[in-house]
Amino acid sequence: MNPNEVIIAVVRTQKAVSMIEKENKLTFIVRLEATKDDVKRAVEKLYGVKVEKVNTLITPRGEKKAYVKLKPEYKATELAIKLGVIV
């Protein structure tokens, strides 16, 4: 799957910002067809970071969320600032 097609949006909720700061995790809305491996490759290619782990879930609204934990040498806060999640 094309990396540009995998990620739909970055989640900007209070919980998502808290996870960025405390757990080095970013939250994305992704396509339902995307696998964890697709999400990992898309984040690594689009944002130039290394991913440690990906957890996914399908919300009651029918959206697929991906919680992406970055490797310790990368800071989720720096990427979040670039993406406009944190000002």
Regions found by a protein language model. Name each.
Residues 1-87:
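Contiguous, often N-terminal, cationic amphipathic patches that form binding interfaces
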